[in-house]
């Protein structure tokens, strides 16, 4: 049995290929059934995200194993083998375990240390239940990887610093305001970055959120999710005074918030400070706003410097995380090797028990017929010894006849003679 990981990801293949190798949730059971029907596959888990498609397998080693798996993958997706082959990577046994642990810990992600991948790996494991039901080593590998990912999060700072624009904006807000539970945030736009920012803010219990967007319908969907109020872009001038923090990210070609608008808002607020985080390109906030007293304006470039600093911190933490993964992978493989010999030990013990029961039964029968007890016990001990050492003796003799000194040494060592 061999543990095997194969796949493609954002490092090895463009999105035009990755999107054609994905496994949709609707057809996952069908894919697993097809995969498990391959004679060499004992168990499998399919991980398919926007950045990677990977198969984690328990397989029987055989000739042309890689070719057979590539052929299955390409046949299933109706792809040309040559198109896929150069983008695939393969990891066996210890390397497969290390790879899964790295993936689950966010060490192999497009955004180093991102936490979402652990949830995706857990979901893949759950959704692939039929694929690993009869592959205990595969189940154990995933369960161990989940605990390693948790350890990496706990013992390192891999996820402590913001490395996305949305998260950096929220981190900046939390640094300036002691608590978000007393502030009102206005989010301008309703795109992906604003969605991420809204979710971060909700997690930190912001007092109130106002979403201003050109299309109210899209904004309303996000507002329903995070518990926010929706206004139109034309309402910003009137409502700006209510916001302590403004995070803006639209596709507008012209600024949405100007100096005059901010002056009116600050006057209405009696010059209580306002934080503006403009992450739009082109900018949503006129640069002159940053010159106003009590208006603290940060651009996407300011955030990038924060992100680069934090990314450097994550890379430093990743060194520690890699050490944890290496240690845990080695320990897991040692455990797995010990498990692989357990069945052999059970068979050997059962064989010895069978000999014991056979000879003991004969000895007891002899005792019942009135035979000499001491002679019967001596005979039992002699026969038991001879039967138990018969096979090791034959192995020693054969090794000697073959002139195999290394095998002789191993046999002597295993018998406790060295």
UniProtKB/Swiss-Prot annotation:
Q: Name one Pfam family in it.
A: GlutR_N
Binding residue positions for NADP(+):
189-194
Its UniProt pathway annotation is: Porphyrin-containing compound metabolism; protoporphyrin-IX biosynthesis; 5-aminolevulinate from L-glutamyl-tRNA(Glu): step 1/2
Recorded E.C. number(s)? Answer: 1.2.1.70
Catalysed reaction(s) here are:
(S)-4-amino-5-oxopentanoate + tRNA(Glu) + NADP(+) = L-glutamyl-tRNA(Glu) + NADPH + H(+)
Query: What PANTHER family is this protein classified in?
Result: GLUTAMYL-TRNA REDUCTASE
Q: Which NCBIfam families match?
A: hemA (TIGR01035)
Q: What's this protein's function? A: Catalyzes the NADPH-dependent reduction of glutamyl-tRNA(Glu) to glutamate 1-semialdehyde (GSA).
Family named by the database record: Belongs to the glutamyl-tRNA reductase family.
Q: Subunit composition?
A: Homodimer.
* Domain remark in the UniProt entry: Possesses an unusual extended V-shaped dimeric structure with each monomer consisting of three distinct domains arranged along a curved 'spinal' alpha-helix. The N-terminal catalytic domain specifically recognizes the glutamate moiety of the substrate. The second domain is the NADPH-binding domain, and the third C-terminal domain is responsible for dimerization.
Protein name as annotated? Glutamyl-tRNA reductase
